[in-house]
Amino acid sequence: MKATGDRTKVPTGDPDPCSVSARITEEPIQTDRLLDLGSRADGALLLFVGRVRDHNEGRSVARLRYEAYAEMAERELEAILREAADRCEVTRIEAVHRTGELEIGEASVAIAVASPHRAAAFEASRYVIEEIKKRLPVWKREAYADGSDAWVRAASDGPPR
């Protein structure tokens, strides 16, 4: 499943609207591309990268798998980004979430925010990751070092059926 992506201008109360991009993808996240975000007017460029860690709740994790209905997840991710743009003075905000099989250390989510000021960039980034954790319809299945696996609580009420 390839990323569909969306680039939408969002009114933020300023004469120049914020540009928003939300993507769900099976492809590795190119974090270096996200560092090109923003313009010369931006004093802050913040990049948050969430990575697959080797443990969770006392268990050794070997890898994990994210599953999602990509179109629905992208719509919700875009809504989250729009909310962040409305709340914070940012000029560009982009988020990418992986699906598929991920190994330890791989980027599972990336959020890039460009803003004239650092406080707004930090606020927007924090808002986006917290809302992703609460609301994004993406399911996670952890594979453990002992050979077992389990669905892990995600934003929705349960694993895909």
Where do the protein language model's features map onto the residues?
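N-terminal, polar/charged subdomain of small-to-medium soluble alpha/beta proteins
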Residues: 1-108, 114-126, 130-161
